[in-house]
Amino acid sequence: MSAHCQVTGRKPGFGKSVSHSHVRTNRRWDPNIQRKTYYLPSEGRRITLTVSAKGIKTIDRDGIEAVVARLRARGEKI
């Protein structure tokens, strides 16, 4: 499972970890990605989305139907 939110488009951030002695090593900051299953009443079926915590809040605020409509308008296959 890739660390990519289908709703918000959030991806990992990349940078450096800096130790006490200032040695820099590569690291990445992963978004809080969850696999969530939602029921689409208009289609009578469930869909599974890979969403971040902010994406879950967006779905709670706007509704799953509106979010799925935006995803399909963007060309994403659901």
UniProtKB/Swiss-Prot annotation:
Any matching Pfam family: Ribosomal_L28
InterPro entries to which the protein is assigned, alphabetical: Ribosomal_bL28, Ribosomal_bL28/bL31-like_sf, Ribosomal_bL28_bact-type, Ribosomal_bL28_sf
Family annotation (PANTHER family): 39S RIBOSOMAL PROTEIN L28, MITOCHONDRIAL, LARGE RIBOSOMAL SUBUNIT PROTEIN BL28M
Tagged with keyword Ribosomal protein: yes
Top-rank taxon, per record: Bacteria
One GO location term (cellular component): ribosome
Lineage, opening ranks: Bacteria, Bacillati, Actinomycetota, Actinomycetes, Mycobacteriales
Family: Belongs to the bacterial ribosomal protein bL28 family.
NCBIfam families: L28
Annotated spans, Disordered: 1-28
Gene name of this polypeptide: rpmB2
GO BP: translation
Protein known as: Large ribosomal subunit protein bL28B
Listed GO MF terms: structural constituent of ribosome
Keywords, ordered alphabetically: Ribonucleoprotein, Ribosomal protein
